[in-house]
């Protein structure tokens, strides 16, 4: 499949976080993630922030983040919205969390 329009390739910094939410906290975590996604998507170095709830196990959430550089991800981690929403409100509601980082090429328009 060919993408329409001009496409250039450049390396990005990608983060995938797998979360296991404490029983009964799914709705609260998803609400906080919605707020965190809105704030993160407008950061200068953010290319994308999406999250998904498993169909088979509603307590399993996958967060997919994409940044221009690793430094942009570091800026995100130091942001006020991440401190409040991520660290203070979401993390205590998780039974487990695994963060994976990747560098790779991807299409940019």
Regions found by a protein language model. Name each.
Residues 1-8, 107-109:
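Basic/polar N-terminal segments that are highly enriched at the extreme N-terminus
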Residues 4, 8, 35, 41-47, ...:
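An amphipathic, aromatic/His-enriched active-site/gating alpha helix that lines ligand/cofactor pockets
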Residues 7-13, 55-56:
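Short, flexible turn/loop "capping" segments at secondary-structure junctions
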Residues 13-19:
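Active-site-flanking beta-strand signature of metal-NTP-handling nucleotidyl enzymes
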Residues 17, 29, 49, 61-63, ...:
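Hydrophobic packing within well-folded, soluble alpha/beta domains
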Residues 20-27:
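Short, surface-exposed ligand-recognition loops at beta-strand->loop->(often short) alpha-helix junctions
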Residues 38-62:
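Short, glycine- and small/hydrophobic-rich beta-strand elements in well-ordered beta-sheets
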Residues 51, 99-104:
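Hydrophobic/anchoring residues in structured secondary elements
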């Amino acid at each position: 499949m060919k993408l329409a329009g001009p496409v250039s390739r450049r390396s990005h910094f990608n983060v995938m976080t797998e979360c296991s939410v404490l029983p009964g906290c799914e709705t609260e975590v998803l609400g906080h993630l919605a707020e965190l996604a809105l704030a993160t998507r407008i950061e200068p170095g953010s290319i994308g922030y999406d999250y998904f709830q498993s169909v088979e196990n509603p307590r399993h959430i996958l967060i997919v983040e994409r940044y221009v550089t690793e430094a942009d991800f570091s800026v995100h981690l130091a942001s006020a919205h991440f401190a409040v929403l991520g660290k203070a409100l979401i993390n205590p509601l998780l039974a487990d969390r695994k963060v994976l980082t990747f560098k790779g090429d991807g299409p940019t328009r």
